Amino acid sequence: MNSTRAITVFFLILVGLFGTLIVGPRKAMTQQDQAAQKKQQTPTIDEYQPKSMLVTKEHKIERAKFPFIDIHSHHWNPTAEEVDQLVKEMDTISLRVMVNLSGGTGERLKNTVAAMKGRYPDRFVVFANMSYDDLNTPGFGKRVAARLEEDVKNGAQGLKIFKDFGMELKYANGQRVHVDDPEFDAVFEKCAELKIPVLIHVAEPSAFFDPWDYHNERWQELKEFPSRARPPAKYPPFETLMTERNHLFARHPRTNFIAAHLGFHGNDLERLGKTLDSLPNMYVDIAAVLAELGRQPYSAHDFLVKYQDRVLMGKDIYEVNEYKWYFRALETRDEYFEYYRHRHAFWRIYGFQVPDEVLKKVYYKNALKLVPGIDAKAFPE
């Protein structure tokens, strides 16, 4: 009996040892495999694109409720075929008039006007631009003013100033051209005389001027486009540019200025409101800043209602299939939906539906008030 028990115990010990030899290494391999698999399946921040599980009402709006004017678009040297296609696409979304801000000056301006307004006189507006080729020659500002007057005679209906003005443009001695540089006073006074608006892009999102660290909410965009960072060693501070811009607007009260992209105050609508209160000749467009409005629907709604006479519809980079996000935000109360460009907003946005009268002003009435030569009969009363 004792012999049998001893044999049984010995057998169990052998089984245990053998099991350890077999199972132990296999368990270790499984842990390694799991770790490797987990590492492989962990997405980067660029790859992580979660789909919302929220179920709410969705409104698919393919065309605007009212015909609208896009005050902020860019088309460089368009061909006849491109313009024909553009009009076909505009018709599908109720885009009645498009403002091309990239008309250039001189012969290029003439060519752009001929290509767009020459073919479709009621569908396009072209803005002129400044050339800085003779910036360092005395009398520059007066010459630009004279060229602008000639451009208006040749079909320009406004002046667009790009973002290099104030940020990157420099004189031969290395001094930065300030936004409120007196050299350009003649240009802005000429705009008042000609009764044309100035659509001006000053600065960039304030986050681009902040430290590029993991607390910067535009970190992902800066990672994708490092050249968008505005480090202090190379660029003036954001607040300096805002001060110069406001000083410029105040110094030319007869000139109507449209600050592009909500003046880069879309993240602080209270500040923007106070700025508009202090500068009655200042207007703003909503081009490329829908994500800012869409993340604060209550504030956005109230802001648009209060400043309904000062805000204009604009898109910036033309893509016909992206306008529907603007329509959905402005015309519905839809909740928590994706923005069309992930790098601009890693957050979802909300509709901030405004009353029809406000919508009409944003879509076309304010532009009709500011831009000469647009046929108002093409729009509702």
Model features per residue range: what roles?
Residues 75-83, 100-110, 133-142, 169, ...:
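Acidic-and-aromatic substrate-binding clefts and catalytic sites of carbohydrate-active enzymes
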Residues 37-40, 44-47, 65, 123, ...:
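Active-site gating loops and adjacent loop-to-helix segments of metal-dependent hydrolytic enzymes
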Residues 69-73, 97-100, 124-129, 159-161, ...:
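Hydrophobic faces of well-ordered beta-strands that scaffold small-molecule active sites
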Residues 30-122:
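An N-terminally biased module of ancient metal coordination in phosphate/nucleic-acid-related enzymes
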